[in-house]
C-alpha cells in the first residue's frame, strides 16, 4: 500500500491550470502587442507618470502646512497622582513614597511622580514625591500632613 501512495513530496504538483505564466505584453501583434494595454496616445501611453503626480495641481505635500514650534529635549514629564487617588490608596493616612506608590500599582517605576490637587483629603499624609502642585500642598498641610519634594 505504501508503494502506491501518491502523497509523497516528489509527487506533489499544483492542480492543472492553477499556475499561469505572466502575460508578456508588447511582444507581437497576436498577444497584447502594439499598445500593450496602455490605450492609444497620451502621456500614460508614452511613459510612466509617478503616482503622486496630480496633473499640475498643487501637490498634497505642498498644500499641507509645515509643522510649527519644536520639541523641548529638556522637558520633564511626570506621572500624575491626584489627592482622591491617594485617599483611596491610604485611607488611614501614613507615609506616601514613590516606592510605595509603585508597590500599590498607582505609578510605573523609574519615572518621576507629581501629586496634583484634584479631590479632597481628610487624613494626615507624609508625602515624599518628586513634585507637588501648590493646591495639593495646601490641602495636604491643611489636613495635618507634611510634604517633601525630591526634585
Curated annotation (Swiss-Prot):
PROSITE patterns named among the record's database cross-references:
RIBOSOMAL_L15
Keyword rRNA-binding in record: yes
Positions of region (Disordered): 1-60
In which domain of life is the source organism classified? Bacteria
Which keywords, in A-to-Z order, does the entry hold? Ribonucleoprotein, Ribosomal protein, RNA-binding, rRNA-binding
This entry carries the following GO cellular component terms, namely: cytosolic large ribosomal subunit
Quaternary structure (record): Part of the 50S ribosomal subunit.
Recorded protein name is: Large ribosomal subunit protein uL15
Q: What broad taxonomic lineage does this protein's source fall under?
A: Bacteria, Bacillati, Actinomycetota, Actinomycetes, Kitasatosporales
- Gene label: rplO
Amino acid at each position: 500500500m505504501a508503494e502506491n501512495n501518491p502523497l509523497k513530496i516528489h509527487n506533489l504538483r499544483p492542480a492543472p491550470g492553477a499556475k499561469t505564466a505572466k502575460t508578456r505584453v508588447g511582444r507581437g501583434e497576436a498577444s497584447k502587442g502594439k499598445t500593450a494595454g496602455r490605450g492609444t496616445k497620451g502621456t500614460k501611453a508614452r511613459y510612466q507618470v509617478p503616482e503622486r503626480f496630480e496633473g499640475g495641481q498643487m501637490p498634497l505635500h505642498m498644500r499641507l502646512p509645515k509643522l510649527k514650534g519644536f520639541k523641548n529635549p529638556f522637558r520633564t514629564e511626570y506621572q500624575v497622582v491626584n489627592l482622591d487617588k491617594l485617599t483611596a490608596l491610604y485611607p488611614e493616612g501614613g507615609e506616601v513614597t514613590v516606592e510605595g506608590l509603585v508597590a500599590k500599582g498607582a505609578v510605573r517605576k523609574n519615572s518621576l511622580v507629581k501629586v496634583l490637587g484634584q479631590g479632597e483629603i481628610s487624613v494626615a499624609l507624609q508625602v515624599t514625591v518628586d513634585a507637588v502642585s501648590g493646591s495639593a500642598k495646601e490641602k495636604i498641610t491643611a489636613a495635618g500632613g507634611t510634604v517633601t519634594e525630591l526634585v
